[in-house]
Amino acid sequence: MTAPAIHPSAVIESGARIGDGARIGPFCHVGPEVVLGADCELISHVVLAGRTTIGPRTRIFPFASIGHQPQDLKYRGEASTLTIGADCLIREGVTMNPGTSGGGLETLVGDHCTFLANSHVGHDCRVGAHVIFSNNVMLAGHCSVGDYAILGGGAAVIQFARVGAHAFVGGLSGLENDCIPYGMVLGNRAYLSGLNIIGLQRRGFAREDIHALRRAYRLLFAPEGTLMERVEDVAATFESHAAVAEILDFIRLGGKRSICTPREVPTPISAA
């Protein structure tokens, strides 16, 4: 075991629990209810507040503010938590807030996540593992983001929206509906522009699985019938395919937002 290395200018309040091998740089402030895991690093000027728990080997860069009270006007000081997983990278100016009584009193971030400069995780959010937030991504309260999702620079996600696993939200997109797993959304307001094929290839999905997802996508968003009717048709066609089932379960589960769909192609206007 290696004792924590704490710069003399850092303020570690009584009650804070600092793991073995942690490194806390100049002018950091760690609150009394913070739990900082083993081998974490706070480079400098990092603030950890509230009932915040951070997993081992997470690195946090200057001017990140983690665990201060939620940005929710209904918040009345109720005890709530923020839990961040292991091996995360949190860059300059990132903010993350704990939960509220309106959302389960906890905000959760999984392992191996990357949050680039000035990105934000709002109160009561659920962020999976291996998620990437590019610079200036804004995740409003009560949102969920699935494993391996990527949010491009400047993307904004409205309260209560869901982003499925392996999805891609394009830079500067404004997402006000739910993005299916493996989907790709673009624009303001964002529309479903297809599947995240490049992401699937990079993560080693088999060609036959990608082909099945493409076929299922075309059937799901065909013009005939209702979405739920098409869900059942796709379920019957791909009854043993796990990735397709994940999309269907996501749609069936539903949420407070609608499912993001492809943009309609305008009907050509006749010159006659």
UniProtKB/Swiss-Prot annotation:
Chief location category: cytoplasm
GO term, biological process aspect, one: lipid A biosynthetic process
Enzyme class (EC, first level): transferase
Listed EC numbers: 2.3.1.129
UniProt keyword terms in alphabetical order: Acyltransferase, Cytoplasm, Lipid A biosynthesis, Lipid biosynthesis, Lipid metabolism, Repeat, Transferase
CDD domains cross-referenced by the UniProt entry: LbH_UDP-GlcNAc_AT
Listed GO MF terms: acyl-[acyl-carrier-protein]-UDP-N-acetylglucosamine O-acyltransferase activity
Family listed: Belongs to the transferase hexapeptide repeat family. LpxA subfamily.
NCBIfam families: lipid_A_lpxA, PRK05289.1
The protein's name: Acyl-[acyl-carrier-protein]--UDP-N-acetylglucosamine O-acyltransferase
Organism: Methylobacterium radiotolerans (strain ATCC 27329 / DSM 1819 / JCM 2831 / NBRC 15690 / NCIMB 10815 / 0-1)
Upper lineage: Bacteria, Pseudomonadati, Pseudomonadota, Alphaproteobacteria, Hyphomicrobiales
